[in-house]
Amino acid sequence: MLQYNKNHSSTWQTFRRLWPIIFPFRVGLVVASITLILNATSDALMLALLKPLLDDGFGKANRDVFVWMPLALVGLMGIRGFSGFASTYCISWVSGKVVMQMRRALFKHIMNMPVSFFVKQSTGTLVSRITYDSDQVASSSSGALVTVIREGASIIGLCIMMFYYSWQLSLILVLIAPIVSITIKLVSHRFRTISKKMQSAMGQLTSSAEQMLQGHKEVLIFGGQHTEKDRFNCVSNRMRQQSMKMVQTSSIFDPLIQCVASLALAFVLYAASIPSVMEMLTAGTITVIFSSMIVLMKPLKSLTNVSAQFQRGMAACQTLFSILDLETEKDQGILDITRVQGHIIFDDVTFFYPEKNTPSLYKINFSIESGKTVALVGRSGSGKSTIVNLLTRFYDIDKGRILLDGFNLNDYKLASLRNQIAMVSQNVHLFNDTIANNIAYARRNFYSRESIETAARMACAMDFISQMKNGLDTIIGENGILLSSGQRQRIAIARALLRDCPILIFDEATSALDSASEHIIHKSLDTLKKNRTSLIIAHRLSTVENADEILVIENGYIMERGVHKVLIRRQGIYAQLYKLQFSS
């Protein structure tokens, strides 16, 4: 579950932050506002036609009224229809633009967050933020804006008309205004609280569904259908409960406002029955005033609901701004190098993972000469992958320093640093695209078709690619679901081969390959590693026997170091791991 800054800003402060996103589309807002006012005015004017119809048309039998009134009605209906279309189109255009801008800003910001951020958050929750919450901001806010302008204009127009015909009766409306405003203020806070809980529940709902879909094979093989069903039932019920709380609050709120308005209507009827007042009223006047008060019920009801609608949008907006306020990866380096030599030094490096009290790495010291290969071996959780995470600056060290070609790692621009590194890990991620575009990921316009095919051939991937109907242009599905694990790993190796970086990182790069394919690929990797600095993490110790140096990591410490033969003769941890592996 997401945990963000809890310094909740007010609705006004949140809206002030949202306004710069809306402002570039102000022309659409202005046009929408004008047409909404026209729409509301046409409704009020059609109601005003009742007075001349009753007093002059029927009361005085004036036939001229029946000549111009149909034309007026057609004209007003035409204005009403055009203004309704224009306002809906403009509001939809503005809200669509705002949703797009919010999603783009959020997507870009999340993409530049440090790795530690993604460790704490579920994918489903983040997807919910990008899709559901950003849509809530625009749809709720635009809906509230439409209601405020159109219904507000209706109320103002009707009130002006009522005061024009009889200010005495219309003064009764003044009595209900404070009651309505106090009620809205009291309920607004509850609407906002429920909205935030609904967003949290939606994130949990998305996360639960996403976990089941991603791990459906594990669910089937371990018979976890009942567990996943119970989990999803729980979060979906939580979502339902929050929705019902919103409905409950709104259902109580609406009748309360309508009761207040009904009392005002009753007072008008009573006041109209007073003889001194009746003398000043005609049938048309009292009909217009009474009809106006009845018609006022609808915009009053809509305005009571606008608080819930607006608070829902502002609550979602505040959640998104909470993410946007989080600090992205630190990138204060100034060095922008085309190609480094690849001389790496870890100097007394100590590192703690966030929220952990014990160091994952403690006083690590080693160096890799340019063009040399260093292997990291050890049991799972010993700290091997952490060293890789620090070299790529997925995390920043707490103590010590890491040097690359004599410069501190922090002195390099992040993009420049990572352009020097090609990495193949055991957890391969492929995109829902063609094989060629996956191999040339992020640089598809930089490499030729021939170079992509050469990389695929060196990675022993052309064996299965050539058997596919579309070859390199085959779409492989989300995360390469149409490929086997071994095929996916070969694509990842081809991607690393194509990048031609001076630093190579292999984190169990051939773990999903059969022995024959692994033997062939290692020949290609040996060619690739020439004149390049290589860092290899391996559990299969046979793959690191030719490394220039082997570091044995245990509980965050370097326990042993040396070449394969020397470490075997020492009969230490490495020798034990080696014997254990080959005896099995």
UniProtKB/Swiss-Prot annotation:
Q: What does the entry list as the binding residues for ATP?
A: 378-385
Q: Does the keyword Cell inner membrane apply?
A: yes
Q: How does it sit in the membrane?
A: Multi-pass membrane protein
| Signal sequence segment | none
By its UniProt entry, which Gene3D superfamilies does this protein fall under? ABC transporter type 1, transmembrane domain (1.20.1560.10), P-loop containing nucleotide triphosphate hydrolases (3.40.50.300)
Please list the disulfide bridges.
Answer: none
* Annotated EC: 7.5.2.6
Query: Membrane-spanning regions, if any?
Result: 18-38, 65-85, 155-175, 252-272, 277-297
Location in or out of the cell: Cell inner membrane
Q: Which reaction does it catalyse?
A: ATP + H2O + lipid A-core oligosaccharideSide 1 = ADP + phosphate + lipid A-core oligosaccharideSide 2
Cite the ABC transporter domain residue spans from the record. Answer: 344-580
Q: What is known of its domains?
A: In MsbA the ATP-binding domain (NBD) and the transmembrane domain (TMD) are fused.
Family listed: Belongs to the ABC transporter superfamily. Lipid exporter (TC 3.A.1.106) family.
Quaternary structure note? Homodimer.
The entry's protein name is ATP-dependent lipid A-core flippase
Instruction: List the taxonomic lineage.
Output: Bacteria, Pseudomonadati, Pseudomonadota, Gammaproteobacteria, Enterobacterales
Name of the gene encoding the protein in the UniProt record: msbA
